[in-house]
């Protein structure tokens, strides 16, 4: 009897914990359903949302509002990628919400900076921007530790692969990526960054914890 009671308490505790994680999210989705739907995602993003390829983003721990917004952008065509656009076309709104809260619930993998020799430059840009050419400090939107801003749909950057981040900044600068919408906030910033700035920033945020 005692063993049955202990098991019931343990199961109830786990259920409440899972519910709490979901309740804390700003997106109305099911973690359990998202996990069941995530098999295809793991081929590129890894079984726990942490990609083994530096060109594919880590999405574990990424805030759900941002993930949901990007999935919708891929489906609607305001953001394009041969693989992601095709996958997003198959997803319903509920599928996207479930996947977003599932990956948000997973622990993000910690990484070190890619190039230690550029830390000072990357940190200066991230924390102070560049007043000479109008580059805003990254932490204003992405936070001092790169955790992002879920309510504003600003992504977490900490631990993100430097190669992936550099590609996104380059795409914003060239206009190949326009998913910042009418605000143009990322395009306006990225086009003012040099290649060296992009490399230093990308390396620095990879090591944020």
Task: Identify the role of each PLM range.
Residues 1-23:
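Gram-negative bacterial Sec-dependent N-terminal signal peptides
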Residues 21-38, 52-55, 105-132:
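Electrostatic cytochrome c docking/interface patches
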Residues 26-77:
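The feature marks the first
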Residues 30, 37, 63, 70, ...:
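Stable alpha-helical elements in mature extracytoplasmic
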Residues 34, 41-47, 99, 135-144, ...:
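The canonical Cys-X-X-Cys-His
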Residues 35-39, 64, 68, 129-139, ...:
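Sequence context surrounding c-type heme c attachment/ligation sites in exported
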Residues 52-58, 74-115, 150-156, 174-199, ...:
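Axial heme c-ligation environment in periplasmic c-type cytochrome domains
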């Amino acid at each position: 009897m005692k063993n049955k009671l202990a098991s019931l308490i343990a199961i109830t505790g786990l259920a409440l914990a899972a519910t709490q994680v979901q309740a804390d999210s700003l997106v109305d989705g099911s973690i359990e359903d998202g996990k069941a739907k995530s098999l295809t995602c793991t081929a590129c993003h890894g079984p726990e949302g942490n990609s083994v390829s530096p060109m594919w983003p880590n999405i574990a721990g990424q805030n759900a509002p941002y993930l949901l917004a990007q999935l919708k952008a891929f489906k609607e065509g305001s953001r394009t990628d041969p693989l992601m656009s095709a996958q997003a076309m198959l997803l319903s709104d509920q599928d996207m919400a479930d996947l977003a809260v599932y990956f948000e619930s997973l622990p993000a993998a910690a990484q070190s900076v890619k190039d230690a020799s550029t830390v000072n430059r990357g940190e200066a840009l991230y924390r102070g921007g560049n007043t000479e050419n109008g580059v805003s400090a990254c932490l204003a939107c992405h936070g001092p530790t790169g955790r992002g801003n879920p309510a504003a749909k600003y992504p977490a950057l900490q631990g993100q692969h430097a190669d992936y981040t550099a590609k996104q900044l380059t795409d914003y600068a060239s206009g190949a990526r326009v998913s910042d919408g009418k605000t143009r906030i990322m395009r306006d910033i990225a086009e003012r960054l040099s290649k060296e700035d992009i490399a230093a920033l990308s390396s620095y945020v990879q090591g944020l914890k």
